[in-house]
């Protein structure tokens, strides 16, 4: 195993490069400087037992999990409808909510105009893991089946694609599909016909998610609690940045950034992707876990499992500004936003239903 390279701060990149690739509104210099000086850009070997990897937080790394929730003390905001089990993930598109439940080989489709109505059920060849909206289509990973499914919410049908590993995240890059394979510590690239083109597998402990934003692709490694740039031209894993002490959930915003929750330290991190650079770190005490983005309001929604709350931050400026703080169902591990209606939907991982909020 090659020893990790020496530490380099992000400020080693030229300021002109950062300016030319920056997207979205101007951010304050003081916050950007803090982020640049506090973030370390490293590469590391892929042996989890190696002691010299400076991105490794502990000797035997484990993925961060949601903090347990107490009993609720306030009525949840908005409307709560039965889910039929523990909600493990949510995604929404065109006024339709997709919900995955623990232990079910299916995804349930709810009409957000009438969330209390009986949902449609889309059967799958394996238990649904993560859900994501990709180019207007709901995509469900099925780790046990080594496959993912594209779900047409209009017809309630699923197109299943098998992959060479355990999929935990899917993203689109033009006409290519990127699939994070947790067990293979790799990202598989599929062409427009879903045929494998290449598998990129360098310097990861675990490939838990893959995201595309701002002209760049990023891999989330939850074991190492770090994000890594993915060079699709050279088919390599590039530089990495630590994402707090317990990277948990991730999404993207319209400013070309990847937003990551740090479940152990209680924070929301914002990374530019090209080049990979930490731009913002917002403390979010109370058990930060799930994250979703509302492009119409420019608000990042973060669930707080220790408090049974969801908090919304306006992320247009140099520092996130709190705009909303609302009570939720117990154990609010998952959250999504429907871009058509701007409704915020939260799932209880404690069998206490699905919460629909119109802020």
Where do the protein language model's features map onto the residues?
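Bacterial N-terminal signal peptides that target proteins for export
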Residues: 3-32
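Predominantly soluble domains enriched in secretory-pathway, periplasmic, or organellar proteins
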Residues: 2-6, 27-29, 40-359
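Sec-dependent N-terminal signal peptides
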Residues: 33-37
